Amino acid sequence: MEYTYSGFENRISAEHLQKGETVKVIGIGNSMTPILKSKQPVICTPVIKDTILNKRDIVLCKVKGHYYLHLIHAIRNGESFLIGNNHGHMNGWISKNKIYGKVAEIL
């Protein structure tokens, strides 16, 4: 899959996704092992109004001021999403407009 930007799980990657660009994102840390290893790149596609999000999707999102490549653990009324890592730690509930990208491919 082609991408137009390569960066880390941060504001700049989120901005490119908000512009409709597909990006390669590199997450740092072990919170998503064994699904993702630290510094393992993924391809994220932009999340738009019509994007369908499901439990267990890996997304680039912002929770309480921090950017994460984490899982959707629960969905409430199709409008709120519980974000957390792969080891059971929950970051919190966010709205869809705080989800910038959805992992389409793990590299």
Positions of predicted regions on the chain:
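Extended hydrophobic leader/signal-anchor segments used for secretion and membrane insertion
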Residues: M1-L107
